[in-house]
Amino acid sequence: MEDEVVRFAKKMDKMVQKKNAAGALDLLKELKNIPMTLELLQSTRIGMSVNAIRKQSTDEEVTSLAKSLIKSWKKLLDGPSTEKDLDEKKKEPAITSQNSPEAREESTSSGNVSNRKDETNARDTYVSSFPRAPSTSDSVRLKCREMLAAALRTGDDYIAIGADEEELGSQIEEAIYQEIRNTDMKYKNRVRSRISNLKDAKNPNLRKNVLCGNIPPDLFARMTAEEMASDELKEMRKNLTKEAIREHQMAKTGGTQTDLFTCGKCKKKNCTYTQVQTRSADEPMTTFVVCNECGNRWKFC
């Protein structure tokens, strides 16, 4: 059963990526006949795939059936709150056609009641960790929420992770607004920098960490450019800082004046050099050269 649902999910994800929902209606009809459980929903992420099809499709029959499926699956997350509710749920199939959608929903619901509490606690961390962002009617804020959600859709990671990119975009915007309390230039620059970093093709890990909740929305809203940078850029900055410190130390300690080196810029031979052990002890020392005429610097091993 799980393999079949996973196969449906993969087909729908490909449809979304190719922006071609042909055949989606047949898949949705087959899904409707599968007795869904909370465990199956969580393990296959089929809900995210169906929701993505719903958003993209212009076919009213497809969107209507997708909405119906999502609505029925959401009932699995709620569960009856009392024993009385449970008894009522068990009695309802007796007065309902056995093959009707309602009967299948109730059958699935009653079959999973005993494990509901444990399964509810085991829901995806992302869904339960953060409260939903308050709604707003401010056109600037709404536009920023849309752009943040679009940035989170970069690379389609949100489909594989199963994140609600629209809600997450709203939470990030809400955190930014709560800190700045205005939609002025500071607010817009903050939003713009988040969007730029989320779309950065060289820094996909940042987007994935935000989508899966490793970086909470309120923390992401406050992160500096240095904190959002890719690991590669952080390493480059670290090396540049080390080299700047080394060159500063060289300038303070001086060096040995020589005419053995020719400056690549001014072609003069009035230079000062310093040798520093930058690698392991058995490796050659690095020679740093400064042209005393034009200030050009270079190094070699």
UniProtKB/Swiss-Prot annotation:
Pfam families: Med26, TFIIS_M, Zn_ribbon_TFIIS
An annotated Gene Ontology molecular function: zinc ion binding
Top-rank taxon: Eukaryota
Subcellular location per the Swiss-Prot or TrEMBL entry: Nucleus
GO cellular component, one term: nucleoplasm
Coiled coil region boundaries: none
Annotated positions of the N-acetylmethionine modification: M1
Kinase in keyword set: no
ZnF segments: TFIIS-type: 259-299
TFIIS central domain segment(s): 140-256
Region annotation (Disordered) ranges: 80-137
Claim: DNA repair is one of the keywords in the record: no
Compositionally skewed regions (Basic and acidic residues) per UniProt: 80-93
Job description of the protein: Necessary for efficient RNA polymerase II transcription elongation past template-encoded arresting sites. The arresting sites in DNA have the property of trapping a certain fraction of elongating RNA polymerases that pass through, resulting in locked ternary complexes. Cleavage of the nascent transcript by S-II allows the resumption of elongation from the new 3'-terminus.
Comment field (misc): S-II binds to RNA-polymerase II in the absence of transcription.
Disease: A chromosomal aberration involving TCEA1 may be a cause of salivary gland pleiomorphic adenomas (PA) [181030]. Pleiomorphic adenomas are the most common benign epithelial tumors of the salivary gland. Translocation t(3;8)(p21;q12) with PLAG1.
Quaternary data: Interacts with EAF2. Associates with UBR5 and forms a transcription regulatory complex made of CDK9, Pol II, UBR5 and TCEA1/TFIIS. Part of TBP-based Pol II pre-initiation complex (PIC), in which Pol II core assembles with general transcription factors and other specific initiation factors including GTF2E1, GTF2E2, GTF2F1, GTF2F2, TCEA1, ERCC2, ERCC3, GTF2H2, GTF2H3, GTF2H4, GTF2H5, GTF2A1, GTF2A2, GTF2B and TBP; this large multi-subunit PIC complex mediates DNA unwinding and targets Pol II core to the transcription start site where the first phosphodiester bond forms.
Similarity comment: family membership: Belongs to the TFS-II family.
Protein's name in the database: Transcription elongation factor A protein 1
Organism: Homo sapiens (Human)
